């Protein structure tokens, strides 16, 4: 689950109270227990730099490091049907990019206060996930 700009991976529990909300939903029988992984989306090439956030680098980190580590530790079963991804605001951009580039990894998606920018990486001739030429790939991902 990806947070919004200026927040961190702990914002879901400190500000959003996700742990309390999810515990209550489980207790009421509205959802089944699951493991929620929250990563820090404020990823840059160099720590403390004034450079823009690098959503491509975050996507690579999620796919190559975070998901395999979580799979190993919590044994989700390694299947798309056992994984989903969600994001708030800036995290919705990161979620959209990741699910569009890796539809084989996720079966569920949540976009909260979301937006999709065509010019996300400063390339007006590319779509929201960096593909060229621009096409409505973000809509295709929801089919």
Model-derived segments and spans:
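Non-catalytic cap/lid and distal C-terminal segments of serine-dependent acyl enzymes
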Residues: 1-143
């Amino acid at each position: 689950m990806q947070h919004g700009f200026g927040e961190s991976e702990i914002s879901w529990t400190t500000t959003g109270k996700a742990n309390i909300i999810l515990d209550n939903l489980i207790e009421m029988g509205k959802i089944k227990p699951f493991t929620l992984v929250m990563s820090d989306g404020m990823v840059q090439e160099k720590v403390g730099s004034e450079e823009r956030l690098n959503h491509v680098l975050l996507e690579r980190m999620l796919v190559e490091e975070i998901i395999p580590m979580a799979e190993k530790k919590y044994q989700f079963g390694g299947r798309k049907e056992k994984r989903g991804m969600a994001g708030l605001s800036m995290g919705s951009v990161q979620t959209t990019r990741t699910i569009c580039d890796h539809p084989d990894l996720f079966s569920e998606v949540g976009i909260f206060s979301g937006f999709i920018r065509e010019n996300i990486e400063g390339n007006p001739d590319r779509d929201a996930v960096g593909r060229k030429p621009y096409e409505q790939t973000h809509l295709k991902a929801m089919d």
